[in-house]
Amino acid sequence: MGILNDDAVLIEPGKISGDPTVVTVNCPDESGLGSTLCRIILEFGLSITRADFSTDGRWCYIVFWVTPDISSPKIDWDSLKNRLLSACPSCLGSFYFCLQSNVSKPPSLYLLKFFCRDRKGLLHDVTKVLTELEFTIQRVKVMTTPDGRVLDMFFITDAMDLLHTKQRQTKTCDHLTAVLGEHGVSCELELAGPELESVQRFSSLPPLAADELFGPDGFDISGSSSNKAVLTVDNQLSPAHTLLQIRCVDQKGLFYDILRTSKDCDVHIAYGRFSSKVKGYRNLELFVRGTDGNKIMDPKHQANFCARLKEEMVCPLRVIIVNRGPDTELLVANPVELSGKGRPRVFYDVTLALKSLGICIFSAEIGRHSTLDRQWEVYRFLLDESREFPLASLRARNQVVDRVTKTLMGW
């Protein structure tokens, strides 16, 4: 393992306006590093338009071409570089030593509470501030009182690991107060101890809703969806690697989905090329090996890996609307990696989509749901009925699902 310096991560702006920014990472390798780097890039509201990836198992070299999402026009490139450097193994530079030495320590969980008057788009505006401050939202409880006020409780972790300081806490509350304006009433931050466990509890999903989200008939990727992702396995071209060729519909987070799935399936990528989009499709070439360092020759292993990849590319997130008593509830399910993390910015994108439709959120929560073979992060939004958007209408419900799905997928 080598000693890294600032040159381990280089960020080169595009030469003209509209050109992608080139992010180069050159550092020691470790299992799942590519997936971790993609996750960080997504957290900053960036889309990966191209990528080249190569590793010999000890050292890796990755080049990302990235562009800001429409909803993230301002990017803190210095902060992105710091985060990428902190993810690289053997970051022994004095500035990053503290970050790297605490990599194995789980981040402290904090509870952010604020009480204010409700308005359309409030939840997204707060989420936007937290995202820009580099907080990760782990759990949420949002409740509206009969007099039109809202109590929001966000369980958050800090990517900068500075929330224990008075300066960071003050900056957070000041930013929120500036956004809430006259709507703001109070803002509190505290370390989330065991006594707050009951507040974090996630109400269980109704069986019918769970069936629709996770059942075998809920999201069928066969049939008409099969042309969205085509995978070809070749064990003849390379003497040491299995070549996996992929052609699929482009979407936000596609390269991340492929890398996280490969990691969870114990498939190691030695070389990968994520080509530019052509007519809405992406072409990828991955030279891969199994955990034993050899080609993937077992037909059953090949079939299982390809089936899992196809599912994650065609249907990485699940979105439905159900009745919850007399009310209407939006459910979004996000697969959780074996590392325990789900796709970033899901809450941000869903609240953005609902704000764009002018739909108020009466209550919201984030929790975990386990199925036979995996764990899911589930987002529940109880939606306010309005004259402008009658949610009893099937057409209106389909419009909500369509807008949320397209925002999540970057379509």
Curated annotation (Swiss-Prot):
Pfam short name (any one): ACT_ACR9_3rd
Keywords: Repeat
Domain of life: Eukaryota
InterPro entries, per the entry: ACR1-12, ACR2/9/10_N, ACT-like_dom_sf, ACT_ACR9/10_C, ACT_dom
Domain ACT: 22-105, 111-194, 243-322
PANTHER family per UniProt: ACT DOMAIN-CONTAINING PROTEIN ACR4-RELATED, ACT DOMAIN-CONTAINING PROTEIN ACR9
Known role: May bind amino acids.
Record protein name field: ACT domain-containing protein ACR9
